[in-house]
């Protein structure tokens, strides 16, 4: 009877030690954090004017886009991490603004941001909530640009040779503020806000150009697992 009690006590002690060890090292050095969820990109547009020949004061606005997203984080120390956000391409519509406000959609594009972040996570490795700050770099690639008949009509395109749109891909810094909330010793909820000061140029096949500040704000929310 005594030997059974000692065995049970030893087992409970071992399990308790393991649980405490896991809690203490939930986001410790060497841990991998994988998450999945959604993200919205909201461009904060400051549009230049389209160069001639076109209507003076022609500008553009850009729609928000929401997509499935996630990311992978590696804890280099208990507080410093490397984060790789991941997402499907974001489709954005372009609309007339300025002197051509009200003409409707003039084009669309897919934005494919590739970002790597260095994060500093506050608090202890096993804390229930860990806010973090991140600084990184983003390569914003624009692909699958399409223009509409409206844009052709405004810029001198024809049905036979419609105006084609090209958006310059750019590299820009990205700032991040977020937080991770521990559900249990393996699962967590993660939310973050990013800001990227991004300026690019639209070039039309008819010769016009338009410089635009997109400066997108990204808002993400996901559920993740620790490994």
Task: Please report, for each region that a protein language model flagged, where it lies by residue.
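Gram-negative (and chloroplast) outer-membrane scaffold detector with strong preference
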Residues: 40, 44, 71-151, 216-227
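Cleavable N-terminal export/targeting peptides
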Residues: 1-30
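Short glycine/proline- and aromatic-enriched beta-strand/turn motifs that initiate or cap beta-hairpins
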Residues: 24-71, 226
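Predominantly the C-terminal beta-signal and adjacent terminal strand-loop region
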Residues: 91-95, 184-227
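Short, conserved structural micro-motifs that define repeat-unit consensus positions
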Residues: 69-73, 178-182
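Residues that define the transmembrane beta-barrel architecture of outer-membrane proteins
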Residues: 30, 64-68, 108-114, 129, ...
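Short loop/turn motifs that connect adjacent beta-strands in outer-membrane beta-barrel proteins
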Residues: 25-31, 79, 123-130, 183-186
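Flexible, solvent-exposed loop segments that connect beta-strands
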Residues: 47-60, 90-109, 141-169, 200-212
